[in-house]
Amino acid sequence: MTCSNPAQTVARSVDGQRAAELLQSVRDHDLPPCLRSLVAEYQTFEGARPLFIWQWVHRLAPKNAMPVVGDDHRETVATNKTILVLFVTILDDLVEKRQDYATFDAISRLVRLRADDADPMPTETFRSDVDGEYVAFARTVWTTLLDRLEDAPRYDRYASLFRFDVRQILTAIEYTTVVIDSPELATRADLDRYETHNMGMYSYLDIDLMYADGDHAGSLSLLRDAVDAGQRMARIGNWLSTWERELREGDVSSGIVVTALERGLVGPEELPDPDGSADVSVAADRLIDRIVEHDLESELLDEWNGEYRRLCTLSERSDAVDLGPFVEGTKDVLRYHLASRGFK
């Protein structure tokens, strides 16, 4: 395992032909029937994200998996993780695209419940400003995921931790709304503290452990440290591939834009209005050009390298679990992020 600075090497490897091959491998990827059905229903809602996203997530899910999952559970785990991402995306769409906080709060109650609590809001009790159809679909996605997870061999051991970690994703989404509404309050430190959890990799780990062949409770602390590094690396890859699109949409919560704000490269008053009521493409393109001139993307790749080295150190300390495949998988995830720029 080479623990130097692979990010730049990965970035250089994603040339036009290689990027096209990676993208085609995603487009050719088949979703399992359960997931295909949920995605088809999701796409009936206005503003739904394209099929490519779900093919991308499902194809890459094994790269984010800890090597504790038995071969007979790998497909189930990949599907469960993709269903989780679909649920998170439903919530993301509500606050980032629709600014529908009432519906967001209604759906969030599903996650904030204890496992044995009753449904927090029957359909007939929705307030008038809550999108009941959207909540009903979100409930279907969430209960489908829980029903599948309950069949996992070690579900009971990790169920409460899973719910806790999913709640951190909700906090990450809520922090994003703070940044969008008040970009002058955004800091990279807060992004790393809160928003990075939007990647959901702690919850991914919980799912892996539910389907583990053995009991890895004794390695849980080290595994969560490893996931922390991997999640930051995944967040950087996501920022690199989406920040320009998000800026044009008025979402200024990416690490690149927040860094530009902190350094005074752009001012809060220059940012596009998140309500999408005006054509801001020209103004956004000017900001993008200015940010690109300062090469902030290279700085993020350097940060990625730092997390990679931390992950390598953790791998060397791990005796009970071979973290090598997870470490190597982070490079593939970065490669696919960079190849999919402009497609997600």
What is the meaning of each model-derived region?
Residues 1-86, 90, 94-98:
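Conserved N-terminal diphosphate/IPP-binding helix and adjacent helical/loop segment
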